[in-house]
Amino acid sequence: PEDMNIYQYVCNLDEKIDTILVDEAQFLTKTQVYQLSDIVDYLDIPVMCYGLRADFKTNFFQGSGPLMAIADSIEEIKTVCECGKKATINMRFINGRAMSDGEQVVIGGNESYKSVCRKYYKKYIQESKEVK
């Protein structure tokens, strides 16, 4: 939850924690990102976060920017676009049509995503505009 104080939660646990793994870290708040850094710096517990850097509109998620700004290290998981180049953007499709607008987070919708390079992102957006 957005109002959860992760640092306090970890401090109140009875058992010893070896490592904290955070999936979908893009959904963390900026405050929670800094709480995780406090866990690393003051409690000496390693934290590993996994998540998307940017949304389908190429904007940072609320947690992505702060996390990338203060992370001790960043390891990118590489994916490949259909053209063979490095995929850097998660393209949203609804009913087979590339989307460049809409809500950042959609739950339970009929959307799908595909990893594409910047060139193919522009190509899909242009094709989508021509279909209108």
Task: Tell where the protein language model's regions lie, with residue ranges.
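Conserved P-loop NTPase "ATPase switch" module shared by AAA+ and STAND
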Residues: E15-L28
